[in-house]
């Protein structure tokens, strides 16, 4: 153990052996930190809660534990001499934007791809537009406004906007950028990548969006330390070539290309897993999505499953969400071979009816006395599945697995059907014990104080359902329409309830492909489980925001009754009355 961060603290002795003291005694306390782990020469790992490191945040000026992920990205960009290609779902950090603008002015070719939901500068929204937003979106906008409002006076000056609104910084520097509408559509399922390629040889691959919430912490929550995320810095021209190929497919001819040549989502050609050597390390990479016409075994989730199945000693998983039934079914024989399996899942998803955490714990949860037909509770179950204790408002946003403390599964790809079959994603498989040790330390940090096993509230819910649902029916699994698969947008799903309220159902927000509809379709019945966003918006009382929430809800659980619809945020008795004769499932 190394000694770090000597801090002065005041200890007030109010009484000792019956003697009252009126003053405080100042005492120096030495804080022990674990020693930094060795890094591989070509593959470095960073986590924003790393206990061996500390840094002072650039925006809130809080000194805290963790690796500064933003600085790692800035350093990589600042080293560029010829090119920087970046694909990231959401980009709000001005430090990264300023580094890109500086390199652009120095003659480096910069290209940026965003998810279209986040491609508009936050400072450009009017007060009226902000007031019309859902509360979650307003909170997100307020977070970004506080980054921009450098002097904290509640007003955004032109100077603050020009220097602190990340997308304005890039636009003023003439950095070319596109989003997933560049293919001529209204947007793909979700452009969920989070990678940077510098000079065709250095890569940043991370689970974090470039936001304060994912990297540092929220302004509104002083105790927030950012959603738990990891970042890989990799030096490999061979691997960079594969990432550049993925980038170029999406970029096409860039801004204003006619006809549109960009390819997103399932428009991209299928490419199987590729393998390269990074020094002495075997690295596999696969880019999502994979069409359902291709076998699951050849998909990104299939690659994850193959890697998990190779375990002989242990599997540790830290996941934002885990809802692919085939993956958990592949894990069960591994468990039966006496392989130790541990899993941590974000509290907002761990105990939902579709969560594979329930299967591993040997239980099922019904919705209206209906169970998913494919559920398969483990026998014997395991008690090493649970949720981490995070600072209020922070999420477990990792998407990693560790096999035998030798192999790491990482990237942007959530372990869901939505990520597998609809989104632009990255999965990396890295066979390197030095790299794995960093992920193992992060897992153990999260697991040390985690709530594992079946919580009492969930146990009571299972017991109550056993009494209320003596005869249960199964919900047959339905294939997701290709144009409506989506994945979770992290900043929109932060559970407001404490861990003691684990039976709640926090709402998540996702996005779907919009397609045009004609006015002649306005009066026909709409299938809520397959309609596009544009079709949903033809229904009375449903605007863009509610249409997106309906799509979010059906990706997690298909609608089977009006009661299911009633659970969607923004739907009430009056709207149900308007909809009941207009919708089917």
Ranges and model annotations:
Residues 2-12:
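Bacterial N-terminal signal peptides that target proteins for export
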Residues 21-23:
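C-terminal motif of bacterial Sec signal peptides marking the signal peptidase cleavage site
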Residues 25-27:
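Bacterial signal peptide processing site
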Residues 31-80, 90-309, 349-406, 413-428, ...:
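HKD-type phospholipase D/PLD-like phosphodiesterase module
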Residues 387-389, 393-398, 403-502:
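Long, C-terminal catalytic modules of enzymes
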Residues 483-524, 530:
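Primarily N-terminal secretory
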Residues 515-519, 552, 556, 566-585:
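Alpha-helical interaction/regulatory segments in DNA maintenance proteins
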Residues 543-544, 572:
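Small-residue hinge/turn detector
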